[in-house]
Amino acid sequence: MRRFRPLTWLAIGFVKGWRALISPLYGDVCKYQPSCSTYGLRALQVHGVFRATPMIIWRILRCNPWSHGGYDPVPGTPEARQWRELHPETARSKNEPIHDLTDDNPRDHEPALRKSIPGYTDPGSTHTGTPSHTRGEN
């Protein structure tokens, strides 16, 4: 049995009000599927207000002119699990290394490791710009 969660229901009411009153003024402008308001509503229903709020904020921040958009289900839902099973390449964590260095000789990866050091400039590189850590100050 689900318990009554007044903050969650208040947030759900806000999202439903937004969808009824504000969304029609803008039309279908969201780059993501489901729309940001549908995402927020689903996140609140599944996770509650405290866990859903950071998800909703992050989703709204990602919905900008520079994003590519696409299908973005709420984490922890059956839709998200099904999407991960059908598209395992999209389930990779941003912190997960693309290549596992543990099985290889580390000396094979030294140039790649050096390039990951902030301020490192490859001696053979033609890049003459200001290092990013100086923020334009010389």
From Swiss-Prot:
Which portions of the chain have biased composition (kind: Basic and acidic residues)?
Answer: 81-113
InterPro entries per the record? Answer: Membr_insert_effic_factor_YidD
Q: Where can this protein be found?
A: Cell membrane
Pfam families with a match to the protein in the record:
YidD
Ranges of biased composition (kind: Polar residues): 123-138
The UniProt entry's GO CC annotations, sorted and at most eight, read: plasma membrane
Q: What topology in the membrane does the UniProt record assign?
A: Peripheral membrane protein
Instruction: Kindly state which keywords UniProt assigns to this record, in alphabetical order.
Output: Cell membrane, Membrane
Where is the stretch described as Disordered?
71-138
Family annotation (HAMAP family)? UPF0161_YidD
Role, per record: Could be involved in insertion of integral membrane proteins into the membrane.
The family assignment reads:
Belongs to the UPF0161 family.
Please state what the protein is called: Putative membrane protein insertion efficiency factor
Q: Which organism is it from?
A: Cutibacterium acnes (strain DSM 16379 / KPA171202) (Propionibacterium acnes)
